[in-house]
Amino acid sequence: MTRLALLSVSDKTGIIDLAQQLIHQFDFELISSGGTAKALQAAGLPVTKVSEYTGSPEILGGRVKTLHPRIHGGILGRRDLPQDTQDMETHQIHPIDLVVVNLYPFEQTIANPNVTVAEAIENIDIGGPTLLRAAAKNYAHVTVLSNPKYYDTYLQELAENNGEVSLEFRQKMAGETFALTNSYDGAIANYFMTLSSENESTLPSRFTVSGTQFQSLRYGENPHQQAAWYQTGTQPSGWAAATQLQGKELSYNNLVDLEAARRIIAEFNPQEPAVAILKHTNPCGVAVGNTLADAYEKAFNADSISAFGGIIALNQPLDKETASLLTKTFLECVVAPGCDDEAKEILTAKSKVRVLVLPDLMNGPKQTIKVIAGGLLVQASDDVIDTPDSWKIVTEKQPTLQQLAELLFAWKVAKHVKSNAIVVTKNRTTLGIGAGQMNRVGSVKIALEQAGEAAMGGCLASDGFFPFDDSVRTAAAAGIKVIVQPGGSVKDKDSIAAANELGLVMMLTGIRHFLH
């Protein structure tokens, strides 16, 4: 008995070859609609248009093509259920064994910043998801192919099973299809949520996130943990759009560290050279310099021991002078918005170092997500831009312009250090970083110990308020002259009084930057 296949695709990759083999090798007849039918006819292949098969023309400018009982009955009919087979015979519905459908490019459409709502709406597929879901639901009898990458595997299944398809394959394709339609509907829902929200940061009552596996990773944080890298959206963006110039395959930990490095370096104006060196998502050296090479040397020397095996982020294209410095130590990854040819040549001497070019270092996700038992925690990303103009001077002593610049630098770095976070800086270079301690004065002591005598005359930034005046007194004893912190403690007055007593400058930002 001749079998029917329904082909209706937006992405026509591989569709002609698939159709040819279905007809000539496996005795299929083809039903198709719209542009797919035209493409098959242009290739000289016999095809019945959906409108001819159903007896109903395409209407509403093509909005209604396949929504018909002869189509959906043929897909949904259960071949092992007498009542279904009787209904199909009564209504002259032929079983459809194969459904090949992919969807209108909605996500690509809305990726265009100039797209109108009307254009977006016309790229919401209705018939396609309906066909896919029907075929996936009836996978016991129907094969559904929702992506060209499955065509060859399907043909191989037919060849190896005397023209049949294994239940295991049909079930797998059903799962892939429901994942696709879920992702597609999620993208549409998120688009409408954005349209209806007065404030883009407002979180919806329903939150949908989905991704397509971009790359399998060797393992996760540890070798016993499985891991994979998923791309959100249909077009590569962010790290998926980066170019890796050399080095080994990126690991899970590399990607986590690279994103942390990107977030830090995005704080600094690309007109002014800046470099950040990280280990385990915490900065160990950050600096602004006269040149990129100068900034790197300052950041490296801030903690040369921790920089070994580190992740380097630069806010300007990598040049030969900086590349030469990078080859002097072992590094895991380097990312920059560009890399000149001389720098590329120099870096080949360290061929295992992963070197990436990510032109758009400044833009990242607008939300952060954490998975907890039974749910997700979603928050707006900590992208607030706070500058000394909005801060409050709370001490008798006033900061100089140079000190204001130093305070801002230290504050930007502290924002990206695990809480409790303390950062000691001078000349817009980190000298000591206290990260992740359970009490704030503990982080103060670590940062000051690391800075040593260089802390004299320096700046100290704290991501959270001081609960007591002990941190201020400890900082002053090490020679710190200016402090920036959020404020908000019930004992702020004690810290301010200590700062006045010890002749320090203190500014309160009014904004906290916890990072967990």
Swiss-Prot record:
Key words, A-Z: Hydrolase, Multifunctional enzyme, Purine biosynthesis, Transferase
Matching SUPFAM superfamilies: Cytidine deaminase-like, Methylglyoxal synthase-like
Domain named MGS-like: residues: 1-146
A GO BP entry: 'de novo' IMP biosynthetic process
Any Gene Ontology CC annotation: cytosol
Catalytic reaction list: (6R)-10-formyltetrahydrofolate + 5-amino-1-(5-phospho-beta-D-ribosyl)imidazole-4-carboxamide = 5-formamido-1-(5-phospho-D-ribosyl)imidazole-4-carboxamide + (6S)-5,6,7,8-tetrahydrofolate; IMP + H2O = 5-formamido-1-(5-phospho-D-ribosyl)imidazole-4-carboxamide
Record-linked CDD domains: IMPCH (cd01421)
Pfam families reported in the protein's UniProt record: AICARFT_IMPCHas, MGS
MF-aspect GO terms: IMP cyclohydrolase activity; phosphoribosylaminoimidazolecarboxamide formyltransferase activity
PROSITE patterns: MGS
Entries under PANTHER family matching the protein: BIFUNCTIONAL PURINE BIOSYNTHESIS PROTEIN ATIC, BIFUNCTIONAL PURINE BIOSYNTHESIS PROTEIN PURH
Family from the record: Belongs to the PurH family.
Family annotation (NCBIfam families): PRK00881.1 (NF002049), purH (TIGR00355)
Entry note about domains: The IMP cyclohydrolase activity resides in the N-terminal region.
Protein name in the entry: Bifunctional purine biosynthesis protein PurH
Name of the encoding gene: purH
